[in-house]
């Protein structure tokens, strides 16, 4: 993997910097590095593809070295270099695609394609010029079963989940009380509602709670907490739990009371915040517990009192909610996030070449399925293919 990264980095630099008119002295170190790559690769043969519709391709390396010059690089020099660069870029692209579409239930962190296995040989270590990528650093750590750490922006840690629970219901669904939520990506929104606006509740207060268990531990997380759940602020028709009918939800939004958020790790509370909104932090957690209350307003203008009558029918439904967004966090496992396109790159290649479903990843690389059942085998394979996708992205956009 280090060799593949160094190949890609060298080729990217060569493609960007070996251009007509450049002073040789400005790129002499790069050209020496490029020539070392050629010396190491010359005389070797590789084969890629042969899975799904990814075609089999054979690669042979026998390229002349780039020369020296006292002046600027001329058109002939650059053209000769470009021919070599383009062949190598095509080779790296195909090695990456070959690796991205393969998976294994055992030791999925290790190279799976014949080409990358061959590049992992001792003879190619002379190409190892650079090891500065976060993905490469973590791949090396994971392959030695040492602790890794990825920094994510808006990590896709929440599997998609949209549902509701009813704490009070009737066959006619005309006086409901309960909780509804939408979890996806790095955001969760939860709303508590009571058609009667807590008219018969103790102290005219309804208590709500929402607990989310993460599939992976997050550390040093920066989080935004808001006293609102905008996705549940407009009318909608909702299918009943048994699918036999539908019921109407017509929210009128109130501010939640006694909001408390707890971040837990293995059942132990690590951080607690009460009535604190905006930016908060959580040190180390695998579970989030949100609790909040709906308080019937003790004093109401006639217009508000008309919204919340003391008896049925209840045409407007008192609703309180919270929004929690994980803006950034560190995780030992690789995840899809807002800054990276690795999941999209891997999925696109697998779809384009009709790669058959393997023993590890779900069909279509369905992220909700993948993160819900994030097994050690999936973790190893995902880290490997994301690392390869990051290498490929240096050359192929």
UniProtKB/Swiss-Prot annotation:
Subunit structure: Homotrimer. Interacts with the inner capsid protein VP2. Interacts with the outer capsid glycoprotein VP7. Interacts with the outer capsid protein VP5*.
Modification after translation, per record: The N-terminus is blocked. Sumoylated with SUMO1 and SUMO2. Sumoylation of viral proteins seems to have a positive role on viral replication.
Residue numbers spanned by region Interaction with the inner capsid protein VP2: 62-73
Residues reported to bind Ca(2+): 266, 286
Phylogenetic classification of the source organism: Viruses, Riboviria, Orthornavirae, Duplornaviricota, Resentoviricetes
Keyword Metal-binding: yes
Species of origin: Rotavirus A (isolate RVA/Monkey/United States/TUCH/2003/G3P[24]) (RV-A)
Alphabetized UniProt keyword annotations: Calcium, Capsid protein, Intermediate capsid protein, Metal-binding, Ubl conjugation, Virion, Zinc
SS bonds (residue pairs): none
Residues reported in the UniProt entry to bind Zn(2+): 153
Cellular location(s): Virion
Gene3D superfamilies linked to this entry: 2.60.120.170, Viral capsid alpha domain
Family per similarity comment: Belongs to the rotavirus VP6 family.
InterPro entries linked: Capsid_hemagglutn (IPR008980), Rotavirus_A/C_VP6 (IPR001385), Virus_capsid_a-hlx_vir (IPR008935)
GO BP: fusion of virus membrane with host plasma membrane
Superkingdom to which the source organism belongs: Viruses
Record protein name field: Intermediate capsid protein VP6
SUPFAM superfamilies named among the record's database cross-references: A virus capsid protein alpha-helical domain (SSF48345), Viral protein domain (SSF49818)
GO cellular component, one term: viral intermediate capsid
Functional description taken from the UniProt entry: Intermediate capsid protein that self assembles to form an icosahedral capsid with a T=13 symmetry, which consists of 230 trimers of VP6, with channels at each of its five-fold vertices. This capsid constitutes the middle concentric layer of the viral mature particle. The innermost VP2 capsid and the intermediate VP6 capsid remain intact following cell entry to protect the dsRNA from degradation and to prevent unfavorable antiviral responses in the host cell during all the replication cycle of the virus.
Record's miscellaneous remark: The VP6 trimer contains a zinc ion located at the center of the molecule. The zinc ion is not essential for either trimerization or transcription activity of the DLP. Zinc-depleted VP6 has an increased sensitivity to proteases.
GO terms for MF: host cell surface receptor binding; metal ion binding; structural molecule activity
One Pfam assignment: Rota_Capsid_VP6
């Amino acid at each position: 993997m280090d060799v593949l990264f160094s190949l890609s980095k060298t080729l990217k630099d060569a493609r960007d910097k070996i251009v007509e008119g450049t002073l040789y002295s400005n790129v002499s170190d790069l050209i020496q590095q490029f020539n070392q790559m050629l010396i190491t690769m010359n005389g070797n043969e590789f084969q890629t593809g042969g899975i799904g519709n990814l075609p089999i391709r054979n690669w042979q390396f026998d390229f002349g070295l780039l020369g020296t010059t006292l002046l600027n690089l001329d058109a002939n020099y650059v053209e000769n270099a470009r021919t070599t660069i383009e062949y190598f870029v095509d080779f790296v692209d195909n090695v990456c695609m070959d690796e991205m579409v393969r998976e294994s239930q055992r030791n999925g962190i290790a190279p799976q394609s014949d080409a990358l296995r061959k590049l992992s040989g001792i003879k190619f270590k002379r190409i190892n010029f650079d090891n500065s990528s976060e993905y490469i650093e973590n791949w090396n750590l994971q392959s030695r079963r040492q602790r890794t750490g990825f920094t994510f922006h808006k990590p896709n840690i929440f599997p998609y989940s949209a549902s509701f629970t009813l704490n009070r219901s009737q066959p006619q669904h005309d006086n409901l009380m309960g909780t509804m939520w939408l979890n996806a990506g790095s955001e969760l929104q939860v709303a508590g509602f009571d058609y009667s606006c807590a008219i018969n509740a103790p102290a005219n207060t309804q208590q709500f709670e929402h607990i989310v268990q993460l599939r992976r531990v997050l550390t040093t997380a920066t989080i935004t907490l808001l006293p609102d759940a905008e996705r549940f602020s407009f009318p909608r028709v909702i299918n009943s739990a048994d699918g036999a009918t539908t019921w109407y939800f017509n929210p009128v939004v109130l501010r939640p009371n006694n909001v408390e958020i707890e971040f837990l790790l293995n059942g132990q509370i690590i951080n607690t915040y009460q009535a604190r909104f905006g930016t908060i932090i959580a040190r180390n957690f695998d579970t989030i517990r949100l609790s909040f209350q709906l308080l019937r307003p003790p004093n109401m203008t006639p217009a508000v009192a008309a919204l919340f009558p003391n008896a049925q029918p209840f045409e407007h439904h008192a609703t309180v909610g919270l929004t929690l967004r994980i803006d950034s966090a560190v995780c030992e496992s690789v995840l899809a996030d807002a800054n990276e396109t690795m999941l999209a790159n891997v999925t696109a290649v697998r779809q384009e070449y009709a790669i058959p479903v393997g023993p590890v990843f779900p069909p279509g690389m369905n992220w909700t399925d993948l993160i819900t059942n994030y097994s050690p085998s999936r973790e190893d394979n995902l880290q490997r293919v994301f690392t390869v996708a990051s290498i490929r992205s240096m050359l192929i956009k």
